[in-house]
Regions:
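Conserved P-loop/Walker A NTP-binding site and adjacent catalytic elements of P-loop NTPases
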Residues: 1-190
Length: 193
């Protein structure tokens, strides 16, 4: 892989393709999405994958992205961000599901049978565990997943204040890198200058 980024290389070495759970912390645009895609590709054919997003808009973006990635494959990509208590049996036909946190919470509470087929869960923006409105739901979901179906969990974030503690709680290997494709310029802006 001549163009593999440091966070991607570290993730593969940490067991990404062996089904190990990871917490990948790296700057925006450093290649975290490809880490998710590698884990998904590695799983499909053996089980289902879930890509968990905090917001409908991000879900729609990831859905379009993965529709394109899997357009020439036998795998089906689905999106469910709507009414959390609506009928969900139709979701069983998809191999990769892009879900909001609230939708997955509803599916877990309704004991949807096909969830037992899930082998990997990607948690985008996992730092939102610290968010007072979305964090508690995400924490419950991750706890249920770890205890009920024990999937590989891949947490992705650019900003985590306590990565070691979070990785330990997730039972995941922490992978951190600060490489970024564009140099970060820092400065102070005061009084219009």
């Amino acid at each position: 892989f001549p163009n593999i980024t440091p966070i991607q290389e570290k993730s593969v070495k940490a067991g990404l393709l062996e089904g190990k759970s990871l917490l990948a912390c790296a700057p925006t645009a450093s290649g975290k999405t490809l880490i998710a895609t590698m884990a998904i590709y590695n799983t499909l054919g053996k089980g289902k994958a879930i890509y968990l997003v905090p917001l409908k808009a991000l879900g729609t973006e990831k859905y379009k992205e993965y529709l394109n990635v899997f357009k020439d494959s036998p795998y089906k990509v689905g999106l469910a961000t709507g009414d959390v208590d609506s009928e969900s049996d139709y979701l069983a036909k998809y191999d990769l599901l892009i879900l909001t946190t609230e939708k997955l919470d509803s599916l877990l509470r309704h004991k949807v049978s096909w969830l037992a087929e899930v082998k990997v869960v990607i948690v985008d923006e996992i730092h939102l565990l610290n968010d007072t409105s979305r964090g508690p739901t995400l924490e419950i979901i991750l706890t249920l997943l770890k205890n009920l179906i024990k999937p590989q969990i891949i947490g992705l974030s650019a900003t985590i204040g306590n990565p070691k503690e979070l990785a330990e709680w997730l039972e995941a290997t922490l992978v951190i890198d600060d490489w970024r494709p564009v140099e970060l310029k820092k400065g102070i802006y005061a009084e219009g200058r």
